[in-house]
């Protein structure tokens, strides 16, 4: 695998664009075009702009195909990737890879173009021609409705060097360059390929590629040097000029305070760059002088906000010591600097903006008179370039010419940014979106929600049915694998939502709520039609424990044709859910409805029946026994003095007394999990309680509780006291040690250390939510083998214990877990006993056109069943790696005989930025792990990827590497390669020939 990108010839690019558009209706993977009708045009630098947005100088403006994809989707202003005297392999060798991480806020450790400067010039001129012809050919807008802006750096000597000077001259007047002549001649020679582009159109393509420039300088560049370069670009080169300014102009204290208040306290940076970079008191007079110089020459001058914001690598984000922050966390700094300069110059200083712009703020930015606006981080996320279409359409409105920046509006944007939910960091560390499996070479499409669900619910299928208001059908899908739709529709830990691809857009689909909607509307019909399985299996099964695990085991055993008796020690089914979880979390009615499903299945339910002896059950004729006894042994917290109350004991008492437990005025809850949150919220509702303090030895970011549980606790008025460790309880006061977070370890995790300080916290009652334990003594009394930790020895596949006829499920295995994990265990046990699979998959594929229509479209939570429509249909089409690749190096191909699109990685287009790794739902990196097309045998030898190099396109003869073996493959001699991979190779040779160099 080589990180060196190889530009495509103009011939190959034209062939690719025309073939793909004709065969598939797409252009470089973009399914929907933005079409400008000319009624919303703006004018800048004497040229037309159909939209004031486009890609920032960076990964999306480095290659021709990147620029074309961005244009097709809606861009009209292109800030071309920065060129400097260091280029090509020399520069590429300085970049550590992977160099991009954009799964939440963005980071990168790349900088200027990795091409040589002459290559960059050629890429931009090829793009210039392609945009001109597709504008006319595909009806996308006026051939002159877009602008290129060159970006150069980093010092005057480099910019005046022959290499960069030739680049600037060529971009200003390209008619004498060989590439301009070649592109024009090629288009004229093949003018008959076009339906709408004429030879006259081609002849009139102007050679004046750029008349504007953006200056980028390195951190620490002296103000005198910045001014000299800008003056040179204005006076000697005659460019309209933007100078990039950094957030460091705001000062260290402002930046640190803003980041901390917004939840980015973990982002580390010192004050070095703030002191070393351009200072505000130097910037203002410099910018004033440059504005005056530009005005004297009838040119425009402004600032580009913002340049990079360097931060320290602390959690192994990227293989570098320093990286550049972008996206949602950069926005509050960038817009604050824009507001500050707008006020300083009374709006007279033009601002070209980049720094966390996206669909949710771009309209307000432009309305404030801040444009053009360029984006990068948002395009690196799923949806990719297609996100531009939504932004461009949003700005389809009457446009006034630029007069000045509205300083007041810019100030409001800055004020709003620090509280904007799209920019504030989540309270907790984000969970991994990855599955614990590697991406396959074929058929990698997957619904991450289903894979993340312990019972593999067919989520996309029932969401589609709920969206169509087919509740009965949705319930049939749900109940196939889940006998507790009301319980899981109310309190499920919903790991599915953590895996939802929508997390990379805005917020996950509210899957749990959609399940509950199906249950509320389809329950009666399901119950009426629910078949009662005949008893077809010999023997009887006893299930001990009527909590979620026991209920699930009984349900699936009945589905499997077993006669089942369910023993529950208490008066009703539900276990911890019914007897402990507070009523404000789940109602008795919801639990009872799930219990009714078991009754309909004719499970013999025996409440108020405590089982002490397994031998007694065997004597009663039960041939198989399932232990779903939970984790009833109370965990303990040892203090030097004083005895805390157990959380589950309190919650049960709270429920029994309707919130009239004797607690006093001050209650302290110790713990940071979901049970601790339930406990604190219940205590807050308890009669006589005035203050509830939740104590945890680390910060809330590291609490194990789900974020929504933390939020609800805070909303209920629970007072969090972080970085405290309890010592002793005396006279209504809890003594705590004050802790502090230590630095990050090699895994990126922060520990805690003692500070030596202590504090007293008022505490009439202390409640410890520190976890429960399995009933080891009971297991041993019944002859079952346990580990040193007191846990049952079980077969991981069947959950069979040391007794061949006894199985275990739920919390009784390893301690407290989730309801849906209990259901998983219940089914696993039932299938082991029944000897058959007891639930089938429901794969209802969404229509491809409807799936693609949602890609790149940001949409917040919708009301009622419309929320189901936010599902991206990943079970039908995933293609995250295709969408997020700036270079179009991951291609979705349609292979005859294969149901879904297959992914091919194109080696020569990849620079190993690693962005596709962040968004692949597998624990894999598509650029390393997908079947790869190599341009040459030499390229193949320089890589470890599995893939192929085409030796003879006509005969389809290829050199192939497959699982470590390299061999010659031909369609007539396919031995050694799976049929599907052979089909993929043939398809590339036949239908995607433009990929072959």
Question: Where are the model-predicted features located?
Answer:
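Glycine/Thr-rich beta-alpha phosphate-binding loop at enzyme active sites
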Residues: 22-38, 251-347, 382-400, 641-642
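Glycine-rich dinucleotide-binding loop and its adjacent helix/turn
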Residues: 519-535, 593-608, 613, 634-686, ...
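FAD-site-proximal beta/loop scaffold in flavoenzymes
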Residues: 642-665, 729, 744-816
